[in-house]
């Protein structure tokens, strides 16, 4: 199982969504023969340092990330009719420079984009994308939402935009979580991957 690495994990810092305890995650990963794992809490990086230390203490390579919220328009727009919804996106730091960019994005999501949730937008994502790996996220991701609305043209447009920004560091995220809609989305994501070479 050494070739498998979890890249989308929520800890106790993902309120109402994460049951994993940071100190227990690397212990379990080691038991399963894994040599790396990521932390991607919702909108925050509060557990990053504790996660890093716990992984290092257990011989696991820590990958610091975040499941950010992306504003539908800009991070400055705060109209309840248009801006109360948001999409999810996974960002993973490749190195220290990526960690700095991720920290900047998460900080700006609170100081400039907070509206119901800490939000970024595509403008600052373009500005601070270097040394980050980007994954399309869960069913709440922008591409997956387009697929669920049966709008493959929009899914293609969004996937192409992210590929244009992140290049080979952009991935379509396949999940096997037992959710019926996920099965349909996975099929369409595989189709998009082949079509757009992602």
Residue ranges, per PLM feature:
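Phosphodiester-processing cores and adjacent nucleic acid-binding clamps
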Residues: 1-198
